[in-house]
Amino acid sequence: MPLGEWIYDEFDYMLDHVETERRLREPLQWMPVDPVPFDARCLRDAEVIVLDGSDAMAFVRRVLELHRSGDHLRGVATTVAPVLVENHWEMTVHGDTRLEMVLTPSALEVTLDHPTAARQFSEMLEEETVYVSVSEEVPMSVGIVDETVGINLTDEQGVAKGGLVTDDETVYGWAVDLFERCRERATPVTPDDSDDLEELVT
């Protein structure tokens, strides 16, 4: 390779690294785990979603859209909202999406405390394409839609700050590993548990 071409490539690489660092500096400070469990450069092409004070629901709408964009949704969640439960209910009970989720006890409790969400959740458990389990050891909220990964960004109090969406293979591998590790330690929730779900949140 000619020296000039090598210098150009190295300079271009440096500029790409600087631009990636600048664009991701704020989002990565809200990454719920520290250090970031993969090379941050894997997120150079990620979609960055930041909570907008003028449209507080924009982030939620993007999450709903992402979850609806594929045939297979896997994930781990430390928080839920009735609108997300309704979305999953429509995707599974009234659709053919395969859903596998690991929730924290507190996330399950929020679901059960909302009458409509609790009913929809119970109906989802009856579907053969739905697998839900509960574990205390879920560190953050991550969704895997087919081969796309969505990462929720939160502050130290767990308040949502935005999210990242990426198709990067390294991030996908990390997300699948996180999901599988959490599921291995989780307690399955079955239709037979529908009358005793409260026991799983204590």
List each model region and its residues:
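Basic, amphipathic "hinge/linker" alpha-helix immediately C-terminal to the N-terminal HTH DNA-binding motif
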Residues: 1-17
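Amphipathic alpha-helical dimerization/coiled-coil segments
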Residues: 12-66, 71-74
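A short helix-to-beta-strand connector/capping loop
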Residues: 44, 95-97, 125-130
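Primarily the HKD phosphodiesterase
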Residues: 63-119
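Short His-Asn-centered micro-motif
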Residues: 75-79, 103-104, 134-136, 145, ...
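Structured extramembrane domains adjacent to transmembrane segments
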Residues: 103-111, 139-140, 158-159, 165-166
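HKD-type phospholipase D/PLD-like phosphodiesterase module
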Residues: 107-141
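Amphipathic alpha-helical interface segments
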Residues: 142-202
